[in-house]
C-alpha cells in the first residue's frame, strides 16, 4: 500500500522514467555484486515484473543466486525505495502473451540482440535489428527472452529533505503481516 501511494505521488508530480529500477544481483563466479537499470513493466498484487534476455549476464546471476536488491529513486518526490526479494522467471505462457502484445520494433530488438555480448561495431547491432524487422514473424516469443518477477519481503522508504533529517521507514514481512520500523537518518 505504501509503495502504491509513493508511486501515485511520483506520477502526479510527472516523474520521468518512473519505470526505471536498479536491480542488483550477485555473481558467484566473479564474487561481485552487479547492478543495472531495467524497465519495470508491471506491478500486480505486490509482484514486480520486468523482461530480459535469458542468456544475459544478469539472468545467469539470477540462476546462481536468486536473492536481489532493487532500488528506485524518484527525484520529483525526493524518494528512494529499497527492496529485497527473491527473483524467478515468469511462465512461458505469460511471456508469450506479453510478447505478442508488444510493438514489432521492440520485438525485433529482443530477437536480434545478444544482450551484453561483445561486438565489433554498433553497425552490426543496426544490421541485425533491420534483418529481424525484415524477416517478420515478430509476434512469436523466442525461448531466450522472457520475464522475471519478484515479490518483496522488505521495503525501505527514504524521504529526503534539505535539513538532511531524512525520514526512513522499513517494512519487513513477518509470516502474513508487515512489521514496521522507523530508521535513523
Q: Each PLM stretch: what is its role?
A:
Residues 1-185:
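Binding-site signature for planar aromatic cofactors or substrates
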Amino acid at each position: 500500500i505504501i509503495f502504491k501511494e509513493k508511486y501515485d505521488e511520483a506520477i502526479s508530480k510527472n516523474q520521468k522514467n518512473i519505470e526505471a529500477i536498479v536491480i542488483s544481483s550477485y555473481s558467484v563466479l566473479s564474487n561481485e555484486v552487479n547492478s543495472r537499470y531495467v524497465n519495470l513493466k508491471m506491478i500486480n498484487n505486490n509482484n514486480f515484473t520486468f523482461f530480459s534476455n535469458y542468456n544475459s549476464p544478469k539472468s545467469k546471476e539470477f540462476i546462481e543466486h536468486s536473492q536481489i536488491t532493487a532500488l528506485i529513486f524518484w527525484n520529483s518526490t525526493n524518494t528512494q525505495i529499497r527492496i529485497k526479494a527473491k527473483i524467478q522467471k515468469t511462465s512461458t505462457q505469460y511471456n508469450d502473451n506479453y510478447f505478442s502484445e508488444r510493438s514489432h520494433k521492440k520485438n525485433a530488438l529482443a530477437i536480434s540482440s545478444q544482450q551484453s555480448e561483445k561486438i565489433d561495431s554498433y553497425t552490426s547491432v543496426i544490421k541485425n535489428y533491420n534483418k529481424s524487422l525484415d524477416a517478420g514473424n515478430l509476434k512469436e516469443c523466442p525461448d531466450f527472452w522472457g520475464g522475471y518477477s519478484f515479490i518483496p519481503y522488505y521495503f525501505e522508504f527514504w524521504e529526503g529533505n534539505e535539513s538532511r533529517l531524512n525520514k526512513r521507514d522499513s517494512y519487513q514481512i513477518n509470516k502474513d503481516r508487515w512489521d514496521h520500523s522507523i530508521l535513523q537518518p
